[in-house]
Amino acid sequence: MIYDFAKTAPMDRYKLLAGCVVPRPIALVSTTDGKGGHNAAPYSFFNVMSHEPALLVLGVDQRRADIPKDTVANIRITNDFVV
């Protein structure tokens, strides 16, 4: 079957991509905000891309078009996160 992603609704693209990796591993990503508050959130869109150099990729969607999730907001403030 051929999917034309340009003509596929975002939620349908998500379902197709999420179904490509089963079972889906879950990473727990922890961050700290600028005031010292802590956040931990589960993410399934992550993977190791390379061992040399060591490269782990984390994909984070937004809540709405202009509001990032707390994880992204915290990473932008502190430049730190733990997977």
Positions of predicted regions on the chain:
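N-terminal structural module
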Residues: 1-83
